[in-house]
Amino acid sequence: MEVLLHKVCGQPESRTMTLRAAGPEDAAAFYALQNEVRAAMPHPEQFVPDTLENIARYLKEDLCIGGWDGERLGAYFILRYCGQDAHNYAAFMDIPREEWDGWANADSAIVHPDYRGNGLQRKLLEAVLTLLRPGIVGIGATVSPENQYSLNNALASGFEIVCRREMYGGYDRYLLAMALSVTFGDTSPEGRGTGVSVKPMLNE
């Protein structure tokens, strides 16, 4: 899938980026991009990094899309099929365990600063949705409340806020959900349209 880049490094540009399914051979590039982007964040704690070994496993077992500018990886999206694993975000949304197999985790969406401003997070998600495993009815995600850029992108893409809670051993996160059997667009934190009950916000 080819997408048009309107700017690169903050300057007007007109060239294409290739979005394609990635495999284990791309693990080193994914890992390097993760670390480069995290190191440049004003608050690196907003993003919990993965190990090279975990990324290689995701690339083998799950759905991973890379955005390539020639030979350079400029963006990626990792969607995990967690099934009955306790790490499935469905476990935190009061979804019955027998339905967990129908939910996937939007694990991470990374865009290098050179390529921001092209709507790549949304375009990567759109590419992922065309390649989903049959039977997936919803996607869960987490975003740091301090990461307004990613939160706005997620809401604009159809995710809705389910709750705010501690995750990953004490990190403050919004838990988001996208139900694939509804028409999206209602991104208010009331939870309408997801079929998932909204829980109270942390400390409210």
Feature map (PLM): residue ranges:
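C-terminal "cap" of GNAT-fold acetyltransferases
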Residues: 6, 167-187, 198-204
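A short beta-loop-alpha structural element at the N-terminal edge
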Residues: 16-32, 43
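Active-site rim helix/loop that mediates acceptor-substrate recognition in acyltransferases
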Residues: 42-70, 78
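Conserved acyl-donor/pantetheine-binding loop and adjacent beta-alpha core of acyl/acetyltransferases
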Residues: 78-108
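A short, internal acetyl-CoA/4′-phosphopantetheine-binding micro-motif in the GNAT/acyltransferase core
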Residues: 94-96, 106-117, 143-144
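Conserved acetyl-CoA-binding loop-helix of GNAT-fold acetyltransferases
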Residues: 108-111, 117-130, 152, 156
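Conserved GNAT acetyl-CoA-binding A-motif
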Residues: 132-144
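Conserved active-site alpha-helix within GNAT-family acetyltransferase domains
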Residues: 145-164
